[in-house]
Amino acid sequence: MDMLRSACFYFLLIVFVILSWSLLCDSRHLGHMEKKLSVNLDLLNKDNEEITKLEAPSTNKTNTLLSQSHAVVNHGDNGQINGKKTKEIHRVKRASDKKVSSKRVSRTWKIPKYPKKQPKSDQEHPGFNLDYMQPTTHPPHHN
């Protein structure tokens, strides 16, 4: 009888641990990600247009004209672009091609501007060397 109780206790303990871990985990399952990957291309085009509208206004008029002229175009299977047939190759400006100004990136300290061929070693950030120092083998001396 005592052995049956201990076996039931351990079984319930294992079930409780497994259930508590599965309830504590907030990770997404792969099924949700697969559904998100099969998004309609029309929705992507609408989202891309909204993103270009939400970008910071540019002071240069040519940049705004270029960003508007390079809108994403939906290509059909038969070579039609927006209902017109064309034989020319159209390029779509991608987000990776855009230049990001350095003011948008936050930094904890000022990054020095050295020439890439000859970096100045005397002006390195002091935290870098301290992170990779070897441990000291001498005990502290108290007088």
UniProtKB/Swiss-Prot annotation:
GO biological process: cell differentiation; lateral root development; regulation of root development; regulation of root morphogenesis; response to auxin
Expression sites (tissue/organ): Expressed in root tips.
Prosegment residue ranges: 28-130
Compositional bias of kind Polar residues: 74-83
GO cellular component: extracellular region; nucleus
Residues with PTM Hydroxyproline: 140
Keyword Nucleus: yes
Stretch list, region Disordered: 74-143
Record's comment on post-translational modification: The tyrosine sulfation is critical for the function of the peptide.
Keywords: Differentiation, Glycoprotein, Growth factor, Hydroxylation, Nucleus, Secreted, Signal, Sulfation
InterPro entries: RGF
Residue ranges annotated as motif Nuclear localization signal: 92-99
Signal peptide range: 1-27
Residues recorded as bearing Sulfotyrosine in the entry: 132
Gene Ontology molecular functions: growth factor activity
Induction: Induced by auxin.
Positions of glycan attachment: 60
Note: When applied in the extracellular space, triggers a root waving phenotype. But seems to have a physiological nuclear subcellular location where it promotes root elongation.
Sequence similarity: Belongs to the RGF family.
Protein name: Root meristem growth factor 10
Lineage: Eukaryota, Viridiplantae, Streptophyta, Embryophyta, Tracheophyta
